[in-house]
Amino acid sequence: MSTVLITGSSTGIGRRTAETLAVAGHTVYATMRDPGNRDAGAVSDLKALARLRGWKLRVVELDVTSQASAEAAVRHVLDETDGLDAVVHNAGHLYIGYVEAFTDNDVSHLLDVNTIGAHRVNRAALPHMRSRRSGTLLYVGSTIQVTTPPFLGPYVASKAAFDALAVVTSYEVSQFGIETSIVMPGAITQGTNHFPGAGHASDLRVAVQYAELDPLVERTHEAHEQLFAPGTTADPQSVADEIERILALPVGSKPFRSVVDAAEAGVDHVMAFSDLTREAFVRRLGFAETLKVKP
């Protein structure tokens, strides 16, 4: 079994993934930004479950907007274990609103959490993984980078950048025996605080000038809910199960990309073609070896 660090484990996909991996017998480090205050309830619940069920699950503070915090969390794992086998990049935040009404600070903050946060954690974890010449970086992306719905502009941009960073990082770390998997969930409307807890554009002076579109924005959650066929649920557990399946696969057999989308938007077909095109171009450049994990 593996030792796995998960970012953003207080709710939703991160929480379900922590529990699912613990049930499977992995040693899980469920990290969250503010375990002493905002996330205290989640900490208490996870610790109680771990005691009751005998899970090897620990809660560790990790604020992905801080390099020092990322490095401290990884050190904590390495001090207690024989090594870190996998990182699940899950931390992220949704913003809803009119693109023009997002200030540069709004957009910078969203990129800082959703995109640069994963890079910080990689910088903390990769020296160890490279020295062992093994490990898995698993990124929880989103189909939204393909479907690009209205009123989610900066969030869409942050997830597209997150995916691109995962891809280009994979070329380099593959030569040190490190695998990459990108799991792309569709809209998750149940079992998470994603939509209810969404942030909003802060420039109200601009936002009011778009007031005629407010009824559409207010339907964003409902609009995503109606995508699913009767009896179909868009629940974080389906994503957690796929993450558990991927991490259990033998070295060298993990899929580079997996789409988990109850809305069946066709993103799996789009990304299959996109990845084939990308890989063909990398081969034309003469860098084919970066597409395979080096033993």
Language-model regions: role of each:
Residues 98-99, 106-108:
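Substrate-binding pocket helix/loop in short-chain dehydrogenase/reductase
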Residues 10-11:
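Conserved glycine-rich cofactor-binding loop
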Residues 122, 158-161:
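Active-site helix of classical SDR
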Residues 175-253:
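SDR active-site lid
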Residues 24-42:
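Conserved glycine-rich Rossmann-like NAD(P)H-binding loop of the short-chain dehydrogenase/reductase
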Residues 53-56, 76-89, 95:
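A glycine-rich helix->loop->beta "capping" turn
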Residues 37, 61-72, 104:
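The beta1-alpha1 cofactor-binding region of Rossmann-like NAD(H)/NADP(H)-dependent oxidoreductases
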